[in-house]
């Protein structure tokens, strides 16, 4: 009789945990809990925290997305990001009187740092900015900072000590402070919910309520078999390792057929679904973001479909996938540190091509800027460059566009930051790396910029 090898058993669990069937069953299980939270707050707007949280909310709830990084809440690294302001949430919170923000975490943690610290820091910073600095007499006795009760007192104290500095950063970021003060008519207060919570419909009349939902149950070692399959806590995390290209959108459109598919056939099933989705004639460019009032659209290359024949448009394709449509200009630019120098190298040529168009790109019905990363970096940064050179801060076309050779005389870091904030407010997936932002600033603000325009 073979001896039991605990190391082999652990390895088997890790292998099973990476299989898409167990991941998707776990996600579907957790999504039922999220459904119950949404049902408890029927007027609140559901929000998914990219990328993990995106999987846990059924598309029938029409969620919007945000990007709060857990690393901004890591112990000793607490931060308020002026690149990820997520101010589009204020429109929703005032309309719906509250939000439900969904995320998850793996490996036995109670909740992700994004929910326990990053978002509470964001809330406290906005509250203090408006109700201590901009409108100090509106709610003079209101508590403005809230952290979860399970955080150690020393960590709470350290975070609270940094809040005034975060407010300073926000006020110096170039955002429209008058608009911020007008939107936030009362302070925001977070409420934390996990599968271990007693579910209620609690909210706060004196505050806008933001319900922070951890979708997955906390289980020892991150795995459990109590539901008849290998339950993976935070199963949606690291989707590159298990999804085989499946997206949350395709999953929720085909949930039943995916979850009932035999395990050994699931990868083929996913491949067929992705192929049929790409070839669907009913798709439109609704998945791209329109940077109103300009004609610029940004988004993922998979979300582009040729507009009607009578539409005057131009496509700036920064992906490796050629769309083979008319008026397409291809400049593949990868994401991350490797993409930043490529972006800097290609932009003068892109600008030269744009300036040679007849009619000009800004007189067309649409200019589509697409990449392979949901316009998180490359497409958003290219849109940022175009806005800085051709538009004012109200997104209206300049009478005389700024040439790249003269941009350092007309633009400042604050101006660039203000345009970035406007893009982020419209396209919440915008989250350029430091390397890409340095490339943008180098092109626009450096006296050594190559003059090609």
UniProtKB/Swiss-Prot annotation:
InterPro entries per record: Rit1 (IPR007306), Rit1_DUSP-like (IPR033421), Rit1_N (IPR033449)
One Gene Ontology cellular component: nucleus
A molecular function (GO) term: tRNA adenosine(64)-2'-O-ribosylphosphate transferase activity
Organism: Schizosaccharomyces pombe (strain 972 / ATCC 24843) (Fission yeast)
Family: To yeast RIT1.
An individual GO BP term: charged-tRNA amino acid modification
Annotated protein name in UniProt: Uncharacterized protein C3F10.06c
Pfam families cross-referenced by the UniProt entry: Init_tRNA_PT, Rit1_C
Coiled-coil residue spans: none
